[in-house]
UniProtKB/Swiss-Prot annotation:
This is Endochitinase 4. The active site is at E142. It catalyses: Random endo-hydrolysis of N-acetyl-beta-D-glucosaminide (1->4)-beta-linkages in chitin and chitodextrins. It is found in: Secreted. Has endochitinase activity. Hydrolyzes chitin oligosaccharides, GlcNAc(n), with different degrees of polymerization (n=2-6), a soluble substrate glycol chitin, and an insoluble substrate beta-chitin nanofiber in vitro. GlcNAc(6) is hydrolyzed at the second glycosidic linkage from the reducing end in addition to the middle linkage. GlcNAc(4) is further hydrolyzed to GlcNAc(2). Has antifungal activity against hyphal growth of H.rufa. InterPro entries: Chitin-bd_1, Chitin-binding_1_CS, Endochitinase-like_sf, Glyco_hydro_19, Glyco_hydro_19_cat, Lysozyme-like_dom_sf. It holds the Pfam family Glyco_hydro_19. GO terms for cellular component: extracellular region.
């Protein structure tokens, strides 16, 4: 026997379907509150939404604690500016006996760079090249030309006991590690929360995992300081020095400022871009 829908049942079906569509749209709006990303501790999906899980952190993930196992893209984004040859010319000067020799790899850098939306990709070609040169210049200075992974002969465990949000773990030290020498428990804790590693209980991973090491440096550059804004808004390389170590500026340590500037000029030349103005701080 054929069942015929009555007018009322058709109406009910219509309103039920409409309600379902509205509900789905509301859910999408709720998920998309952080559209275009920048949400602390979450992944930015390939469609520009913040969240967690494979749909957000998997293939196409743009920034945050991405888990995609896909090989890093080297033809677009930062990879189109920094080829493996250019990268090796920048970091390859470390002597064979240096701990950093072989640690700072191209694939790790590209993976870290691609995890942060806008890093080296948010401006004109010249602006993007200057940002990459500025990042590497400060990293080269901090690591002795990429010779070191960890701070040499630290005189402190860099534990701020007054910081209750990121309390120090017993027996752990939070001395400088990685390209920008991540230091202090509160920075390890915050970076770990954003990138998703245990920065407080396992700070050593910043000195043993090349990708995480680079990610902490790009995190500091993009999230924890105004380095990215400074170099992309025309404030000049000197503003990145002030953001990283303001004590060097205004005559505080002319030699270290000169070291950073020399690296910056060298890397700008390698990337075929002028340095811009305001190199000192």
């Amino acid at each position: 026997m054929q069942i015929m829908a009555t007018q009322n049942s058709k109406s009910n079906i219509f309103w039920s379907s409409s309600a379902s569509v509205v509900l789905v749209l509301l859910l999408l709006v709720d998920v998309g509150v952080c559209q275009n990303c920048g949400c602390n501790g979450l992944c930015c999906s390939q469609y520009g939404y913040c969240g967690s899980g494979e749909a957000y952190c998997g293939a196409g993930c743009k920034e945050g604690p991405c888990s995609s196992s896909s090989p890093p893209s080297t033809g677009t984004g930062v990879g189109s500016i920094v080829s493996s040859d250019v990268f090796n010319s920048i970091v390859g000067g470390a002597a064979s006996g240096c701990a950093g020799n072989g640690f700072y790899t191209y694939d790790s850098f590209i993976s870290a760079a691609n995890a942060f939306n806008g890093f080296g990709t948010s401006g004109s070609s010249d602006v993007n090249k200057r940002e990459i040169a500025a990042f590497f210049a400060n990293a080269a200075h901090e690591t002795g030309g990429f010779c070191y992974i960890e701070e040499q002969n630290p005189t402190s465990i860099y534990c701020d006991a007054s910081n209750t949000q990121y309390p120090c773990a017993s027996g752990k030290t939070y001395h400088g590690r990685g390209p920008l020498q991540l230091s202090w428990n509160y920075n390890y804790g915050a970076a770990g929360s954003y990138i998703q590693f245990d920065g407080l209980n396992n700070p050593e991973i910043v000195g043993t995992d090349s990708t995480i090491s680079f990610k902490t440096a790009v995190w500091f550059w993009m999230v924890n300081s105004n380095c990215h804004t400074a170099i992309t808004s025309g404030q000049g390389f000197g503003a990145t020095i002030r953001a990283i170590n303001s004590m060097e500026c205004d005559g505080g340590n002319a030699a270290t400022v000169a070291s950073r500037v020399n690296y910056y000029q060298k890397f700008c030349q390698q990337l075929n871009v002028d340095t811009g103005s305001n190199l000192q701080c």
